[in-house]
UniProtKB/Swiss-Prot annotation:
It comes from Helicobacter pylori (strain ATCC 700392 / 26695). HAMAP family: RNApol_bact_RpoA. Belongs to the RNA polymerase alpha chain family. It catalyses: RNA(n) + a ribonucleoside 5'-triphosphate = RNA(n+1) + diphosphate. The keyword Transferase applies. The N-terminal domain is essential for RNAP assembly and basal transcription, whereas the C-terminal domain is involved in interaction with transcriptional regulators and with upstream promoter elements. Keywords: DNA-directed RNA polymerase, Nucleotidyltransferase, Transcription, Transferase. This is DNA-directed RNA polymerase subunit alpha. The lineage of its organism: Bacteria, Pseudomonadati, Campylobacterota, Epsilonproteobacteria, Campylobacterales. Residues 1-238 are annotated as: Alpha N-terminal domain (alpha-NTD). It is an enzyme of class 2 (transferase). Its EC number is 2.7.7.6. One of its GO terms (biological process) is DNA-templated transcription. Homodimer. The RNAP catalytic core consists of 2 alpha, 1 beta, 1 beta' and 1 omega subunit. When a sigma factor is associated with the core the holoenzyme is formed, which can initiate transcription.
Length: 344
């Protein structure tokens, strides 16, 4: 029998459909028509932006003064060493379980390696540190050479450029960009489900994959908890009558557009392709049409697909339509970054 409702149906079912390694598929149901996507998209964004991970943000190498130095007795120069280091995913054991509301949680680890050896991520395991992708290469140390270095590893979320960590560094340390998010992929599907014979209800199926720093199901629960806390503020205090700021590029949901393309963790081929035409910021990619991106010199299908996937994960698919005001505001913000040399 058809009824006229005065309140939406409350979802009552959450199931783990698949769990393998660092990947999980979760279903939530039932939702009123239109409610599923309303909730699924912000949960996806929070998984990408608010999941807590670990990253090295400070590096000190004995005998090295800046990132453009060479490493004596090591095949890789400092720049390549840093790039390899950023591909390694850490877990700082001492910081696991600590209150995430505490700021500037970090550990310092010291390393010393003597050649000849092929230094890999697994060699960085210690009482303080666990490596979740142990086979990643780091450096090739030649015979009779020694490599001594120290890392400062922070607990954090999202992407933090080196400009923002410089003041945290002790003397002698080089600041590094910190890519903290442990989420490799999160997508969702909306399906129709029957409720008492009515097919006009919906189910969300999340497919979440992490890099191993955090269990994917725990990451999902944490994102839901963050969302609940963010919305809970409206029930706890009166909403102030403040004026809305129309500058799109200053809003929180556009902040990641001013991040450097290094934050996208692109392959070397993709990065070099964009670097050669002067693309430095994510926002510059968002402003490009599909045709413009495909028309970039040496942009093959594989590279295009990789960039498209990364932009989609950020919530800005290739060819995202922005209003004229949004485009103009974003362009001004990017120009401002260029004038400041990348410091926002």
């Amino acid at each position: 029998m058809k009824v006229i409702k005065t309140a939406p149906l409350i979802p009552s079912e959450i199931k783990v459909l698949e769990k393998e390694g660092n990947r999980v598929k979760i279903s939530l149901a039932p939702f009123e028509f239109g409610y599923a996507v309303t909730l699924a998209h912000p949960i996806r964004r929070l998984l990408l932006l608010s999941s807590v991970g670990y990253a090295p943000v400070g590096l000190k190498i004995e005998g090295v003064h800046h990132e453009f130095d060479s490493l004596r007795g090591v095949t890789e120069d400092v720049s390549l060493f840093i790039m390899n280091l950023k591909n390694i995913r850490f877990i700082a054991k001492a910081l696991v379980g600590q209150d995430s509301s505490l700021e500037n949680q970090s550990v310092v680890v010291d390393y010393s390696f003597k050649g000849p050896m092929e230094l890999r991520a697994r060699d960085l395991n210690s009482e303080q540190i666990e490596i979740v992708n142990p086979e990643m290469p780091l450096a090739t140390i030649n015979e009779d050479a020694q490599l001594n270095f120290s890392l400062i590893i922070y607990k954090g979320m999202g992407y933090v450029p080196s400009e923002n960590t410089r003041e945290l560094m002790p003397e002698g340390y080089m600041p590094l960009d910190g890519s903290f998010t442990p989420i490799k992929k999160v997508v969702y599907e909306i399906e129709n489900v029957l409720v008492e014979g009515d097919p006009n209800y919906e189910k969300i199926i999340f497919d979440i994959e992490t890099d191993g720093q955090i269990d994917p199901y725990k990451a999902f629960l944490s994102a839901v908890k963050v969302m609940s806390k963010q919305l809970g503020v409206f029930g706890e205090r009166p909403i102030a009558n403040t004026e809305y700021s129309g500058d799109y590029a200053q809003r929180d949901d556009a902040k990641d557009l001013s991040a450097k393309i290094e934050s996208m963790n692109l392959s070397a081929r993709c990065f070099n392709c964009l670097d050669k035409i002067g693309i430095k910021y994510v926002g510059e990619l968002v402003l490009m049409s599909e045709e413009e991106l495909k028309g970039v010199k040496n942009m093959g299908k594989k590279s295009y697909d990789e960039i498209a996937e990364k932009l989609n994960d950020l919530g800005y698919p290739v060819g995202t339509e922005l209003s004229p005001e949004q485009r103009e505001s974003l362009k001004k913000r990017l120009e401002k970054l260029e004038d400041k040399g990348g410091n926002d």
